[in-house]
């Protein structure tokens, strides 16, 4: 067999020293032809517009730059700088800018983050995906790499740094009961078209009381979730007639949607454990009730599965359970009390309930962190200040 210092495997060029120089040259050669195509499609008074060229860049060039970046991201900065030049050429064509134009300004104008940050984003997201996928073949390899690697940086070490900053991430959904055994729920959205924030307190009170009068003898449980600007999250439920109030501070940075689901989950567990036969869950979260009704949640399938199981258990104990939607901040006493409790939980010094991140929420946290890093770079950059005065936010 012929000895080679470079080999191509699954579209990635590996060299004997893993410098990735051969792969970046390969990427540059592929992208240069596509940049020439973009040039032929652009012009000052004719040709494709900015949005069309940006779409072409994302499809034909950025996709090539992204492929395999979790592997070649360990290359030296000098090697990866070749790829930055490719992005710069493409953005100049898209904006019709001259060579002297600030690259940072072009990136902001086109909404394309620096490649360094994009690679970091894709790397962290792939690390999260590995961690949350059961029996992923790469997981054990990465664990071994962290222990034996002598390099200052590696894919395993960099992703682990990020994973250490966030709570545990939920794995795949495993149903406890067959879906055909789940109790079907039809929430009541009657108030959706009857009252809103512009309705007078008197109208709101009369409309809500008229609806609740249909369910005389039911225990009404109000639930709510809250999140502040710092990412602190709380959830609560209350039963005014029984004088019961429960509030919890949840894991930071999870969504309000998740907080609302946790509040309902805790209320359902209270109903189950205290064997309440007739109960109404009152919430202002339309999205959570729609998820319960449809049986599908894009961001929280695990938690929704838990809710369905608890609802089924309550039904099997001959419990009569009703879900009612009410508008937020319309003077409904129980709803306002739950909202106050949820906001009060934000001041708790310790987290009462650790909530594992779902994949989409963890991805959103990556995007938030990378977006903040890009904003800092743009704010502190000494170039492109003319655009910065008009567009200080990236």
Which residues does each PLM region occupy?
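RNase H-like, metal-dependent ribonuclease domains
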Residues: 18, 40-58, 63, 73-394
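Basic, alpha-helical interaction scaffolds
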Residues: 2-70
